[in-house]
């Protein structure tokens, strides 16, 4: 089981008299995720234990992507440079169509298309904003896209039942 969310830094101020609100969208946005693995035998669990302990809490990073977020046969190459914090890129003239809700990778980070993009040199709108500047000609990766992650806390643990089956649940945040 995988629970994913996009966390945003948004400030909200509400009047105690009129309940009118004002919002301010700060730059912060990151993916967060909790993963629960199916029950594993001792032999299967050993490598998971070693991996989690080897991360040394929040100090280590790793790549991870949702195994169901795979879109084969889609190709989008950037037609121009894209600055950090951008939320759209212009595809090259041979770029494929992309449906809203499609995940992709640029550099070390995961993004989701927020609107349909038609084939050709059109804008691909996405969230969260770019984490790094991207050069023209860079290709978006739609095949098992991943992001760079770290554990969300320094505690590691797992459970074992009477049948010697191991259970793992761990939380992670995008490593920015």
Show which residues each predicted segment covers.
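N-terminal targeting peptides, primarily Sec-dependent signal peptides
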Residues: 1-13, 33
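Short, conserved charged micro-motifs
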Residues: 42-48
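Small/polar beta-strand repeat architecture
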Residues: 1-6, 66, 73-74, 95, ...
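Oligomerization/assembly interface segments of phage tail-like spikes and tubes
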Residues: 21-42, 160-176
